[in-house]
Amino acid sequence: MIQKKIFSRITSPLVFIAVLMFVTLSASCKTEDEKKLEALFANGNYPFTNIQGEAPEVADFILKNKEAFLLDLNYVLQNNHDDLFVIADKSHFLEKDYKPSDVLPLEKNDDYVFYRNDLSLRTPAEKALRVMGQAAKNDGITLVVSSTFRSYDYQKIVYERNVKQMGQAAADRESARPGTSQHQLGTAVDFGSITDEYAETKAGKWLAANAMDYGWSLSYPKGYEAVTGYRWECWHYRYIGKPACAFQKKWFKNVQQYMIEFIHNWNQLSIE
């Protein structure tokens, strides 16, 4: 209707054609991502886990604010220079030899503490960890790094040990099978005691309140075991970058799993 009113006032054929081309091109530029977005949510499907029943609410919010969502999404993807959104969970496996080339041993520093000599992280994660560690230190908090990168083979040892100690079902709530661990990505860190009690420590409380400001996201939040596949882990954070943390908080109920699954499915989908 709006286009008809505009065109009715145009007398020059050349101007009419120019306006028509502009409208057509503008529409096509906008609709490619919109079509992709709608395809991901088509037929009652969701591009992330819906076990908690939150997907309809998240989907409704996104689809009612497509333009703003797509602007944020494209900003996050365009600034993902370090490939920080690789998915690793109980449904998505990493290859046995998967190891990013920039995984390097941790070096003693003044920003955080570690007591093992076999710890390593990807370079962007380690740099961000130093920044966060310094910020915590300024607040009188010392961050203790307890576990970082794990190879496929090392994770196999950890998982099999847990199965032997606690049984299959309990181990699957506590420990990732080889190829499904975020630790193999080289961007995940376990802090402190690696126990539930860590949440009540000064460091645990500081991380819960501030980690996202430095690009670190809690991977397994309380109440989302059905979504993540793992029980609450107050000590386990994954570096995804500050833009992605803000994106997760704004659009995905602050649940990392929802956002990572969405980005994975977005990247997999192509619209002809």
Regions found by a protein language model. Give the residues of each.
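N-terminal secretory signal peptides that target proteins for export/translocation
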Residues: 1-8
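Extracytoplasmic cell-surface/polysaccharide-interacting catalytic and binding patches
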Residues: 29-148, 152-272
